[in-house]
Amino acid sequence: MTRYVISRLSAIALLALAPALALADGAQDQLKAFVAKVQSATGDFTQSTVGPQGRTQPAQSGSFAFQRPGKFKWAVARPYEQLVISDGKQVYQYDPDLAQVTERKVDQAIGTSPAAILFGSGDLDKAFHVSPLPDRDGLQWLRAKPRNADAGFSQVDIAMNGDLPARVELLDAFGQTTRVDLSNIQANPKLPAAEFHFTAPSGVDVVKM
């Protein structure tokens, strides 16, 4: 499992555990409020990717959950099942069609990808240039650009609506834009520990990276 794959499948995680941002009013303040007030959440997502030539890949949809610090589940239900789940120490990607599970340590898997914002182990400003964007589609936006030229992506735009994340748009190093729309967000539910526990199904290949 590459960091690039994780950054796509866990795009919701970009919003979950970011360090508080002492920035200007607008999307930055809303993200700060979300981080301060929301310790866990569940919701639904739709995800689509458009290539540099305008070619659109099949849309995905599913559900997500997260809990600070560092736990999340990103479950693709359609058109094909796929699961990325973190227990805070390990990240697992399960692909039923391939009958394969890939396992990495959280730090190794996330590295300097956008999902590093999820874990909030350091100062966001040290890893990203963060700036406000003009309002668009009735949402307030911010942009984070990696300071590391080898991050594998160019920028990630995050849209906020009423102190809740509404959309993520990731531009990768290949010129592809992945858009994730979030809905039905429930803030601060009580989530059982088993929500972020993963055991590989019998008979599948387990690859440890």
Swiss-Prot record:
Signal peptide: 1-24
Keyword field: Chaperone, Periplasm, Protein transport, Signal, Transport
GO biological process, one term: lipoprotein transport
Keyword Signal: yes
Pfam families linked to this entry: LolA
Coiled-coil portions: none
Gene3D superfamilies in the record: Lipoprotein localisation LolA/LolB/LppX
UniProt xrefs under CDD domains: LolA
Entry's localization field: Periplasm
Keyword Transferase: no
GO cellular component assignments: outer membrane-bounded periplasmic space
Family statement: Belongs to the LolA family.
Name by which UniProt lists this protein: Outer-membrane lipoprotein carrier protein
Name of the gene: lolA
